[in-house]
Amino acid sequence: MQSVIAQAKRIVVKVGSSLVTNDGKGLDHDAIARWAAQIARLRVAGKEVVLVSSGAIAEGMQRLGWARRPKEIHELQAAAAVGQMGLAQVYESQFTRYGIRTAQVLLTHADLADRERYLNARSTLLTLLSLGVVPIINENDTVVTDEIKFGDNDTLGALVTNLIEGDALVILTDQRGLYTADPRKDPAAQFVDEALAGTPELEAMAGGAGTSIGRGGMLTKILAAKRAAKSGAHTTIASGREANVLERLAAGEAIGTQLLAPTGRLTARKQWMADHLQLRGRVVIDGGAVEKLTSGGKSLLPIGVVEVQGEFARGEVIACVDAQGKEVARGITNYSSAESRLIARKPSSEIESVLGHLNEPELIHRDNLVLV
């Protein structure tokens, strides 16, 4: 078995907090120097690399003299603001040794939820790569709230992979990879060398939350791989404690767990819709509509809508859920929530008489709809 990273041209590398900090007590400059050296050699080998690095909050805690990770979001935001300065400085100084320029890019969910800002972020990152710059990405913790956070840098890494149409996502952690069960509790646990991303059984195998330093457990990594696979990107989850792990992966050595993407990728527009983490509203659809969307590739008509939940405007991305609340699709709505409530359960021929105007005969056109 060969590493899927070997054939990848554009790679997103996510490095966890435990791999760039001294057990949460500030940044580990020597460790960051090693990551910079490996990425520099990947660049020489012709690969484009985007780095998603944790460590800002841990560095901020050290600079502020805090022994424990705070729970209040305003304190976490303050620590991130202080620590982000140090994180950028250390990476810049290390990459400069190899003649490589770095760029700090801080993103929020709002940046990726808004279509124009999404395209601007994509354009900026692709321009940086074309200039030979290594973008170093983190969430803009200073301005986000719990309700609009990516949640962890594993998710952010997957979203960035999709944003730039990366070939592979490498999630480096302090664990070897994925096991069928927690090996610390189950002696019969087997290591998973390779699996198909998005397989339901993988989520059952994954453990709970991460450490006190970081936020991401194995489950977030499994879900990140599932998300990255939608754009056709493969994911490797491997231990960052392995010597020269990035170079060895790039050389074809199979290290860690490889989660392979199914054949095919979503169009850029549908990928953007699929990557929304928070939606303003949703519509409950009947069984017939579920069948038409999932098997027939049809548009969603108002007659198939049972209930409209939330408040949204025309042009926003909303979810389509079945009677049990399971999301089956999402897409760009042609009508606001108020209008949708008025035309729900009605044939398209009655839309104009009910609303006084007709935007489109569909609530969501199939070209603006993606299955999830």
Curated annotation (Swiss-Prot):
<keyword id="KW-0067">ATP-binding</keyword>
<dbReference type="GO" id="GO:0055129">
    <property type="term" value="P:L-proline biosynthetic process"/>
</dbReference>
<dbReference type="GO" id="GO:0005524">
    <property type="term" value="F:ATP binding"/>
</dbReference>
<dbReference type="InterPro" id="IPR015947">
    <property type="entry name" value="PUA-like_sf"/>
</dbReference>
<keyword id="KW-0547">Nucleotide-binding</keyword>
<dbReference type="InterPro" id="IPR001048">
    <property type="entry name" value="Asp/Glu/Uridylate_kinase"/>
</dbReference>
<feature type="binding site">
    <location>
        <begin position="173"/>
        <end position="174"/>
    </location>
    <ligand>
        <name>ATP</name>
    </ligand>
</feature>
<dbReference type="InterPro" id="IPR011529">
    <property type="entry name" value="Glu_5kinase"/>
</dbReference>
<feature type="domain" description="PUA">
    <location>
        <begin position="280"/>
        <end position="358"/>
    </location>
</feature>
<dbReference type="InterPro" id="IPR019797">
    <property type="entry name" value="Glutamate_5-kinase_CS"/>
</dbReference>
<feature type="binding site">
    <location>
        <position position="153"/>
    </location>
    <ligand>
        <name>substrate</name>
    </ligand>
</feature>
<dbReference type="InterPro" id="IPR041739">
    <property type="entry name" value="G5K_ProB"/>
</dbReference>
<keyword id="KW-0641">Proline biosynthesis</keyword>
<keyword id="KW-0808">Transferase</keyword>
<comment type="pathway">
    <text>Amino-acid biosynthesis; L-proline biosynthesis; L-glutamate 5-semialdehyde from L-glutamate: step 1/2.</text>
</comment>
<feature type="binding site">
    <location>
        <position position="54"/>
    </location>
    <ligand>
        <name>substrate</name>
    </ligand>
</feature>
<keyword id="KW-0028">Amino-acid biosynthesis</keyword>
<keyword id="KW-0963">Cytoplasm</keyword>
<comment type="function">
    <text>Catalyzes the transfer of a phosphate group to glutamate to form L-glutamate 5-phosphate.</text>
</comment>
<dbReference type="InterPro" id="IPR001057">
    <property type="entry name" value="Glu/AcGlu_kinase"/>
</dbReference>
<dbReference type="Pfam" id="PF01472">
    <property type="entry name" value="PUA"/>
</dbReference>
<dbReference type="GO" id="GO:0003723">
    <property type="term" value="F:RNA binding"/>
</dbReference>
<dbReference type="InterPro" id="IPR002478">
    <property type="entry name" value="PUA"/>
</dbReference>
<feature type="binding site">
    <location>
        <position position="141"/>
    </location>
    <ligand>
        <name>substrate</name>
    </ligand>
</feature>
<dbReference type="InterPro" id="IPR036393">
    <property type="entry name" value="AceGlu_kinase-like_sf"/>
</dbReference>
<protein>
    <recommendedName>
        <fullName>Glutamate 5-kinase</fullName>
        <ecNumber>2.7.2.11</ecNumber>
    </recommendedName>
</protein>
<feature type="binding site">
    <location>
        <position position="14"/>
    </location>
    <ligand>
        <name>ATP</name>
    </ligand>
</feature>
<dbReference type="InterPro" id="IPR036974">
    <property type="entry name" value="PUA_sf"/>
</dbReference>
<dbReference type="GO" id="GO:0005829">
    <property type="term" value="C:cytosol"/>
</dbReference>
<dbReference type="Pfam" id="PF00696">
    <property type="entry name" value="AA_kinase"/>
</dbReference>
<keyword id="KW-0418">Kinase</keyword>
<comment type="similarity">
    <text>Belongs to the glutamate 5-kinase family.</text>
</comment>
<dbReference type="InterPro" id="IPR005715">
    <property type="entry name" value="Glu_5kinase/COase_Synthase"/>
</dbReference>
<dbReference type="GO" id="GO:0004349">
    <property type="term" value="F:glutamate 5-kinase activity"/>
</dbReference>
